[in-house]
Every structure is written in structure tokens, then in C-alpha cells.
């Protein structure tokens, strides 16, 4: 397929709103839950089956797989606990082996932040992987959990991806607010859009009532705080220190995370740390 050729998403209304997903697009869906992500993955899979194409599911999260192998789905397993470099190279090798014009669905980028204890490495993975997928004319979907990452990490992802789409849902409605759509434009493209279930269209919000209802939902689902100026690891340490000094709580699980991340994976060293270190010693090492 040619570069920037239109590709169907399985949702005609979405294709109309965005002037189509294009070959080479990395699409980041900023969502509140993985259920929101599946609203877009399931139609993509159905469209690819109709077109006789395969979908590669890049599975690396601890949760059950979003898609099962078979019927046009190939599942590729990866382990983030191997570390940033090994994980990134394994993903890159899989992409290289697949070649051009492939279609990918990735697990949640936020799970990489949890595995590596830092937004920085999650962002670095995306900044390395996204351009390679673009180079190979692939289409790739990535979910990102809203409010879980530093503003800097989200900005790095937005800078790199071709599309960044904010998704909001409640019991009645589904909305998309495009934050970035690269290399295409329409007068209404960057307005919030509501999905009309009967027609399948995504219509821009223009009436006062609908706009007010949308921003009320945004306010409800958006958890923005001053801590989002910090990397996730900095937030974790700050919250842990605050909890310890206020409530005297420093659990073995928290100690394991800090010692493994900052110190060593060697069991003998970890045993010595647990014997001789107090919580404030860990905080001092972090400084």
C-alpha cells in the first residue's frame, strides 16, 4: 500500500471525522479504562477480517489478553520485566520481521510505566517505536490511561504520534476530542464529537447544552493535580514519604518496589537493606 493511503477503521463516522486513518498512522487513544479502548479495537478487527487482513496484537500487560489468537489475529508476547532495552529491541525485531503495511494493536502504554516505575522510559519506548512503525507504513493503536502520567510524558507522546484522541464515555454517550491529527484538517476536526449510535456518525458538538454536558463529563473523568508535573516515580516516592511521615505506614511491598528499583535485584543485598535500612534511609538515597 502507498504511504498515507486511507485505511478503514471499521467506524465510518470516525473515518469521516478524521479524514480517515492513514497508513503510517500511530493512533494513541487517551482513555479512562480499557473498555473505552475496545470500542475502537473491535471495529478495526472486524474491518480487517472483512478485508482479508491480519491484526497483530502486541501483548505485554499482566492483565488477560484483550484479543485471542486465531481468526485473523496473531498474538505476540513480550515481557517488560526484561528491562527497557531488551523489551524495546524484542518489539522492534517483531515489527521488522512483519515488514510493511501491517496492523497492530498494543496493550496499554501505562502498563510500561508500572513495570519500569517511570514515565520517562515509557515515553522513550514510544519515541523509539512510533517512528519505526511510521517508516514501515503500519497502522498501530496504543491506549494511554488518562491522569496517570506527567504532563511532560504526555507531551512527548503527543509530539511523536500522528493522532492523539481523547475519549470520554458515560452510561449514555461516547465522545472523542481530537488533540492531534497530523497532516489533515477540516473546519470541525478539532471540536469534541459525539457518537450517534443509530447513524454511526460522530457529530461535532455545537449546541450549548451538549457542550456543557461534555465538559461536565470531562471534569468528572479528568484527575489533574499538581503531581502531574512530576514523573510517576517522583510521585510514588513523594506519596510514600508523605504517607510514612503522616501515618507511619511503610509496607513490605513498598519497600520491595523501592529497593528493587533504586538499589539491586540481588537477594543478599536486598536482605541486608531490609535488615539495616529504615524508611528515611531509602528517602535519603533517592535524594
Predicted regions span which residues?
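Conserved inter-motif catalytic segment of the P-loop NTP-binding fold
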Residues: 51-114
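Helix-loop-beta substructure at the N-terminus of cytosolic sensory domains
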Residues: 35-38, 49-52, 259-286
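Substrate-engagement module of ASCE P-loop NTPases
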Residues: 115-116, 121-148
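Phosphate-binding/switch region of NTP-binding enzymes
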Residues: 145-202
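Short, charged/polar "capping" segments at the starts of alpha-helices
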Residues: 37, 63-68, 149-151
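C-terminal regions of RecA-like/P-loop NTPase motor modules
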Residues: 2-4, 184-259, 263-267, 273
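Glycine-rich P-loop/Walker A and Walker A-like loops and their local beta1-loop-alpha1 context
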Residues: 8-53, 57-60
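Structural motif
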Residues: 28, 103-107, 141
Amino acid at each position: 500500500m502507498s504511504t498515507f493511503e486511507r485505511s478503514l477503521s471499521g467506524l465510518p463516522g470516525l473515518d469521516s471525522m478524521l479524514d480517515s486513518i492513514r497508513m503510517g498512522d500511530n493512533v494513541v487513544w487517551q482513555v479512562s479504562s480499557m473498555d473505552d479502548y475496545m470500542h475502537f479495537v473491535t471495529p478495526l478487527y472486524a474491518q480487517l477480517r472483512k478485508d482479508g487482513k491480519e491484526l497483530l496484537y502486541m501483548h505485554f500487560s499482566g492483565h488477560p489478553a484483550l484479543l485471542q489468537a486465531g481468526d485473523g489475529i496473531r498474538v505476540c508476547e513480550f515481557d517488560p520485566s526484561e528491562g527497557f532495552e531488551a523489551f524495546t529491541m524484542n518489539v522492534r525485531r517483531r515489527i521488522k520481521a512483519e515488514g510493511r503495511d501491517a496492523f497492530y494493536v498494543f496493550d496499554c502504554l501505562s502498563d510500561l510505566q508500572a513495570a519500569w516505575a517511570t514515565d520517562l522510559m515509557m515515553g522513550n519506548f514510544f519515541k523509539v517505536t512510533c517512528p519505526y512503525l511510521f517508516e514501515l507504513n503500519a497502522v498501530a493503536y496504543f491506549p494511554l490511561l488518562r491522569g496517570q502520567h506527567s504532563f511532560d510524558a504526555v507531551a512527548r507522546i503527543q509530539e511523536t504520534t500522528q493522532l492523539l484522541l481523547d475519549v470520554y464515555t458515560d452510561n449514555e454517550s461516547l465522545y472523542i476530542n481530537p488533540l492531534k491529527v497530523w497532516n489533515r484538517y477540516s473546519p470541525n476536526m478539532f471540536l469534541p464529537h459525539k457518537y450517534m449510535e443509530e447513524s454511526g456518525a460522530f457529530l461535532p458538538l455545537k449546541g450549548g447544552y451538549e457542550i456543557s454536558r461534555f465538559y461536565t463529563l470531562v471534569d468528572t473523568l479528568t484527575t489533574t493535580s499538581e503531581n502531574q508535573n512530576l514523573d510517576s516515580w517522583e510521585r510514588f516516592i513523594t506519596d510514600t514519604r508523605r504517607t510514612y511521615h503522616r501515618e507511619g505506614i511503610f509496607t513490605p511491598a513498598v519497600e520491595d518496589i523501592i529497593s528493587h528499583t533504586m538499589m539491586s535485584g540481588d537477594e543478599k543485598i536486598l536482605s541486608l537493606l531490609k535488615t539495616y535500612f529504615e524508611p528515611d534511609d531509602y528517602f535519603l538515597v533517592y535524594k
